């Protein structure tokens, strides 16, 4: 074993240097944690142009977990193993040391299932589908995640690791083309000459592996596998959550990660060796926990393989590392630290700036290649400007190979500490500018957020604009004049049915999920009710506009602040801002500097960084240069959140000379009186408080910014007081699941809206399970969290149930400590318990729902919710948002009484929360919650009864339309009619084209929202790209939509065709006399005017040209 010394920060540079010098040699760089492995992998592509550098990720689950790892991680591991075994060139692998203990499939496994496709190769859809299933791909209706594929007609869509999505078009028995497509838009982006497909999992289920599993399972665990869903799933060829923990049972033998390379040299340090020993100890602990849990329950279907069966031993791996060719590295930083440290150690009394000293260092090392590394684009631009000010030239680089001598090289390079070698001097901007150095998030921004709300399920209540509340039963096809046509079947009172043609689907709006009385078809009651509501909406709209106008009339002095000091404040933020955060911050900055009062809503999912955005606003106002003693008030709904915000603000604003206080029930009355006096005199710059801040005895000296966190938690009287402040102060409201009232205000343009939909770096979705109360699973969940160094929440909605839960926890997890918090305790006692939980002084916090708002403890990542069916949807979502807020996977267990039969609405709530696991689900949750509980009021004086009259969607549409009319905007008012088009053509989306009925309804809904011909054509292009060439019936539908748009412009209520021409009936109130007379005059031989606003146009028609003829007729009418 060789030993070498170099700076710790140069670890990747050193590994690349060795790799480059030994062209025929494989290397493994082993590090002591997963985060460092990923960081070094990203650095490697700057230090080397060699493409044969790989990263093997760790699972995001713990040993003996009964949930499966993230599919992206599973597929990335499989992809890496495939490349290692199929690439004959020398390779460098970077990985977490613990992965060296993993038992993996035999090394020839991935080469057996390696598949290369290219255009014109002979392959049928069925053949490829079978191979994909064998390669662990899952067949779904649509492809959205890594490892999924879908079949639609002559097209297969497949998602590979990356993720990268490909569309394979077939023509009979060969592949016609392969295209890459965008997962979010489903639109293809470029053609590919070949496509390499390998297994997306380390386990494939075929006759051989399933046979091995059966035999090995029998040998290890005996025959007692009756009613075991894991065993039954696997022998049936289906995946099962957590079956990865039984991997060795599927193969005759296993290989190690080292076996996948050709006699590699391992580069490691003593920390890596220590990590291997600690991982083995953890595995042993988890094994004991799982074994003990299994003993408590007969036929537990997660049998535990011994650590020796599941992993290689630490002693064997350590012995392998210590072989003669491997390299043990140690670190010497003292000399380098003093050299680089001297740059940034400029004292206050020195005349030289930090950059004067930097350029002295550069001048002394100009014989070397000097590289200044910036972590982000903003610092890169600042460094460029500084270099130019010092009259040096610079060279922008992306790779180390591009670096030149006698010039300063700069680039965006993920390096966090300076170091030097004989040939190079690396200096990081993070040390020069005191900024953070992290890695930008590669997660794509969530697309079409509000479009995801546009679901309509069979059995849901709906509202027809003309006929009122009904129940959507299903899509149904009818034959009309020998042609099939899709209709929405709506049930009304008295078992009456209404059939709405799909091209008129926009007349149908979702009502919600409350049980309601159905309207009667043909009754005048609906029209009377709608007309009355329209008058009330007009009043509300006028009031809303007056509020907005009154605010705009209040001129505000544009906020000015010190940009250099602001940059320093921003640099103290320990994370990279997401794209959406930066956009929201820029929106706020524009609001504060434009001379008008700000009224903005920040909608961002739980844990997506709304608080940091608010803090930027606070800084801009509190440090305003042109205001005398400006003040900021932050109003929060709970004492716990107030205390947390106060602590965070104190830490974040440290060193900026701002006086920050909190006012809530934890503050003594004596201290509260002092705070009130200091607020009135202007001595306090930032006050954070609960509803106490909204009391009439609170006087501000110069309140310039009001921040409202989770506004929906405040009562009506408190909201009225908040409104009185809005006329003189800037207002910023924040919400994770925006209540419809607030969201409606934003969508109607009366309140500015910023959406934060991009998750932070490395954020993982919370795994959510709905299950009967089970002490074994609860014990296992709590112990697993404890063993990975974390803490757990145990939420009990009712205080009276806490004693029982406490007794049960004493029995099932006696080794864990806990404390209780609930609303009947004194605020000071709650504060004391929460402080201890923050500090990690006990393992489990048993609490009521008082923790639902804003609690942020990154070490607490397991939550059990007792009797979850008794909580509302937004409550469940907010509670779940307390976990998984860092880089650690969160686990939420929603328990219900095992013998309890759930009501339909309770069951639906739990289904929604379980299925809404994706990051950024808050908007979907808000919509579902509105469906389940109805909307709140808009301006305080009216509750949700009005909305129940017509349903949420129609109410929103009516409100938007009325506000637009009152604001005199160029938006067409509600059409008093819907054109009915009957051209005797088949109009529907065939099952062979889109087989999933829910997707088909969603597409029909989207079609109903198309507002012009360009949108129709774009939609058509998207359909062709996603599903293949349009069937004639679908094409007819889109053509009829375009004709319908023309009918709107011409006030045509009916357009019918027959063998001898068209019959047009104009809307009764439309004045079309001039156009009709001109048209009749021009085409007197082909036209007839009939009573009831009808126009007959005579022309022999056939199916193939009927669309063309109809278009020609309407365009002629339009242009005449």
From Swiss-Prot:
- Which residues are recorded as binding ATP? 604-611
Q: What's the domain of life for this entry?
A: Bacteria
Q: Which CDD domains match?
A: DEXHc_TRCF, SF2_C_TRCF
Gene3D superfamilies (alphabetical): 2.40.10.170, 3.40.50.11140, 3.40.50.11180, P-loop containing nucleotide triphosphate hydrolases, Penicillin-binding protein 1b domain, Transcription-repair-coupling factor, D7 domain
Where would you find this protein in the cell?
Cytoplasm
Query: Record's Pfam families?
Result: CarD_TRCF_RID, DEAD, Helicase_C, TRCF, UvrB_inter
Keywords for the protein's UniProt record, in alphabetical order: ATP-binding, Cytoplasm, DNA damage, DNA repair, DNA-binding, Helicase, Hydrolase, Nucleotide-binding
> What protein name is recorded for this chain?
Transcription-repair-coupling factor
Q: Which organism is it from?
A: Rickettsia typhi (strain ATCC VR-144 / Wilmington)
Please state the gene responsible for encoding this protein. Answer: mfd
